[in-house]
Regions:
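Intrinsic low-complexity, repeat-rich intrinsically disordered segments enriched
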Residues: 1-42
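Surface-exposed, low-hydrophobicity beta-strand/loop segments enriched in small/polar/acidic residues
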Residues: 34-174
Length: 174
């Protein structure tokens, strides 16, 4: 049945009721942005001070509220830390799944996710540091209820502590 209403007047099909499924429709980017359809979400979590001691692991855990794909991971701390190839921090994120038994590495296991002077980078006080995601797409997929372990591992003896570390994760939703 064609819409015979004047322009600007909404047309309502009496056959469409709550719970009706529409198929074959598409949403353009403007419609999606102006709608209430979730396209992504982010979460931040503060951890404990990263100590200077060797072999220390500093873990923070988050539970993912909805299914999605990790699209960005960032770190920020109050203190600066000089890059050093002997005394450095390595950042990692593991998806432990809903049972706690998962092992999927969500960050690349490369020097880019360290504070090494060769391949890594120093930490600037109160600045965001982008972390490099794993190149395997399947490792970035999360389900609602997945538990993620965000870890900062100290190698050597750091020049100073890094206080008020905050981790920010961004996810896209299909």
């Amino acid at each position: 049945m064609p819409n015979t209403k004047p322009v600007g007047v909404a047309y309502s099909d009496p056959e469409l009721t709550s719970g009706t499924t529409m198929t074959g429709g598409t949403l353009d980017s403007t419609t999606r942005v102006n709608s209430n359809i979730q396209t992504g979400f982010s979460m931040s979590q503060q951890g404990a001070t990263i100590a200077t001691t060797t072999g220390g692991t500093n873990d923070v855990f988050v539970v993912v509220p909805a299914a999605g794909v990790l699209s960005a991971a960032r770190f920020s701390g109050v203190d600066a830390l000089t890059a050093n190839d002997t005394n450095f921090i390595t950042f990692s994120i593991a998806n432990l799944g809903t049972t706690g038994a998962g092992t999927a590495a969500m960050l690349a296991a490369t020097d880019a996710n360290t504070t090494k002077s060769t391949g890594g980078a120093a930490l600037t006080a109160n600045a965001l540091r982008s972390l490099t995601l794993n190149g395997t797409a399947a490792n970035l997929v999360v389900a609602a209820g997945d538990r993620l372990r965000i870890r900062a591992t100290v190698s050597g003896t750091l020049a100073n502590t890094v206080t008020f570390p905050v981790y920010s994760l961004t996810f896209t939703v299909a």
